[in-house]
């Protein structure tokens, strides 16, 4: 599973004083995009981040640009994906997932060839799971929970693979 995109909010020690007027201020540096809204001048939204290492690089870059310390980093959303070439019986997975206390499964082959696994618990990602065993995880914020979800999906692939 590979992290494809991450959105984070970085909280600055002091108010950012940029003459941005009533509209948001967008700053593009390297592959990152930083957005500052006038109603929250202590917060900087960062996008275009592809790894946790890049998140640290974005933080250092921001500290260098504004000459002040980032006091807190909050991960708002992540997007992971994994491409597999297995063959998974989604009907069996759907039956199995009816008893899950973590995810609610939605599977309607006429609408979408894959399965949606919607979280029942806070901070868990939404998972799109297709019959090849490929999956994407969207919205998770906690790295430990994301690792648990990855292991969970891999167990589903092992258990229901044809």
Please report, for each region that a protein language model flagged, where it lies by residue.
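Intrinsically disordered, low-complexity polar/charged tails and linkers
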Residues: 1-127, 132-136, 140-162
């Amino acid at each position: 599973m590979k992290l494809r995109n991450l959105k984070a909010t970085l909280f600055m020690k002091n108010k950012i004083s940029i003459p941005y007027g009533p509209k948001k201020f967008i700053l593009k540096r390297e592959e990152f995009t930083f957005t500052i809204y006038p109603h929250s001048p202590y917060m900087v939204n960062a996008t275009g981040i592809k790894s946790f290492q890049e998140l640290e690089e974005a933080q250092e870059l921001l500290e260098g640009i504004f000459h002040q310390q980032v006091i807190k980093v909050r991960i708002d959303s992540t997007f992971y994906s994994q491409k597999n070439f297995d063959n998974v019986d989604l009907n069996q997975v759907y039956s199995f997932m009816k008893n899950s206390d973590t995810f609610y499964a939605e599977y309607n082959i006429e609408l979408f060839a894959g399965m949606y696994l919607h979280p029942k618990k806070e901070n868990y990602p939404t998972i799109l799971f297709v019959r090849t065993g490929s999956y994407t995880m969207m919205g998770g914020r906690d790295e430990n929970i994301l690792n648990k979800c990855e292991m969970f999906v891999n167990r589903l692939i092992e258990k229901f693979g044809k």
